[in-house]
Design a protein with these regions (language model features):
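Positively charged n-region of N-terminal signal peptides that target proteins for export
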Residues: 1-5
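Small beta-barrel nucleic-acid-binding modules, primarily SNase/OB-fold domains
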Residues: 16-189
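Bacterial N-terminal signal peptides
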Residues: 7-13
Length: 189
């Protein structure tokens, strides 16, 4: 199943590349976060406002820790980034998931190119940038609160900004979170 999905996605990308058409961002408004046991801080189920279909959104540019303890190597890698223990990393994972759910309680906007983020969901995951009801970038909120590391795939943003400038902005927010001992940074001596 996953192999077939991957082949399909790669085939679509190859077709678009052959046609010389870049994948443009699409704006999907009035989206709703929906509960699912696999939701975490950077990957979660969404009901789209346009067609009411369910997708799994995976944030571009950031990575929140895993709460599922079966992924020990990944948790250890994420903890090493922050300089914290496995237990602290899992605690931050739960905080990040709750933070995201709270921030997305009101309808929000999804910007996506419908690029596959792989993953284990039967729905498939697509990379997204999320703008909250308060017009805040969810990536920035997670990083400035010490709940996510700067990580993941890179792309030009929906508003045309270069990813290097955006990543520099995230780095500023991360430095501030470290100084103020927010989120995972509170555990660092």
């Amino acid at each position: 199943m996953m192999r077939a999905l991957l082949c399909f996605v790669l085939g679509m990308l190859a077709t678009l590349a052959a046609q010389g058409k870049p994948l443009e961002f699409q704006k999907v408004e009035n989206c709703r976060w929906t509960a699912n046991r696999w939701n975490d801080g950077d990957s979660f189920h969404v009901i789209t406002g346009d067609a009411g279909r369910e997708i799994v959104a995976r944030l571009y540019f950031v990575d929140t820790p895993e709460a599922e303890t079966a992924y020990r190597d990944r948790i250890d890698e994420q903890g090493a980034y922050f300089g914290i223990t496995r237990e602290q990393t899992v605690a931050i994972a739960h905080e990040a998931a709750a933070f995201t759910a709270k921030r997305l309680a009101a309808p929000f906007t999804v910007w996506t190119r419908w690029r596959s983020a792989l993953g284990r969901s039967a729905l498939g995951r697509v990379y997204c940038i999320i703008i909250t009801a308060e017009a805040r970038d969810l990536n920035e909120l997670l990083v400035e609160n010490g709940l996510a590391r700067i990580y993941g795939t890179r792309t030009t943003l929906f508003d045309g900004r270069d990813s290097r400038k955006y990543l520099a902005r995230l780095a500023e927010l991360e430095a501030q979170a470290k100084r103020e001992k927010r989120g995972a940074w509170r555990f660092v001596k």
